[in-house]
Amino acid sequence: MNNFNELNIESKLKNSLKYSNFIKPTPIQAKAIPIALKGKDILGTAQTGTGKTLAFTIPLLNKLIINKNTKGLIVCPTRELASQIIDTITKLTINDIRIGSVLLIGGESMQRQLRQLNKRARIIVGTPGRINDHLKRNSLKLSNVDYLVLDETDRMLDMGFTPQIENILKFIPKIHQTLLFSATLPSNILKISEKYLRKPERISVGSLSTP
C-alpha cells in the first residue's frame, strides 16, 4: 500500500484522510491497517513516532462508521500521549464523521469527563488509572467495546499498571479485536498477549517520527 486511497475503507473516511493531508502511509501503517481491517488481532513492535496512532485509528473509525452499536477503547500510559491520540481522532472526525470521543486522564475535570460520557462517546481514550476511576463510579460502560488498543504497553507495565489493565479487560466482552503495541517485547508483554490476544499477527518496524 503506497497511498491511503488504495484502502478498502468507507468513502467518508478516505475523504477525511485527504482533508487532513494524510496521503502516504508509514511502514507501520502500511503493515498494520490492512490486517486490522480484516478484524485480526495485532502484536506490534514499534517505537514512538512511527505513525502508530493512525495505524490503529483508521481501522477503528472504519469499524464504527459501519457498525453504529460498537465502541472503541484506547489505553495508553500518559496524559500527553492520550491527548495526542484524541487530537488525531478529532482531526479525522470533525467534518463528515460524527463519532463522539472522550479523553479520560488524571488532572482533568472529572465533571467534564462525566458530561462527555453522558453524551455517549463511542471512542474512549485514556490512561489506566482514570479509566478505572470511572469503572468504579459506574460512569463508564465497556460492554459494547469490540475494538481495544493497548498502546506503549511496555511503558504501562513498567509504570505498574498491570492490575489496572487486567481489571479493564474484565469489563470488555470476550469477543473483541485487540491491537497491542510495544517498543519492546519482554516476557511480561508476551504473557499478556498469550492471555488476551487471539492468534495475533506479529508486525515490527523501526523508528521514524510522525503521528
Regions found by a protein language model. Name each.
Residues 46-50:
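The conserved Walker
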Residues 141-210:
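Post-DEXD/H (motif II) to motif III coupling segment of the RecA-like Helicase ATP-binding lobe
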Residues 9, 56, 66, 87, ...:
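Short, conserved catalytic or interaction motifs in soluble domains
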Residues 43-45, 73, 179:
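Short hydrophobic/aromatic beta-strand immediately N-terminal to the Walker A/P-loop
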Residues 6, 24-25, 74, 124, ...:
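Conserved SAM-binding loop
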Residues 12-15, 68-136, 144-147, 190-194, ...:
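Conserved nucleic-acid-binding Ia/Ib motif block in the N-terminal RecA-like helicase ATPase lobe
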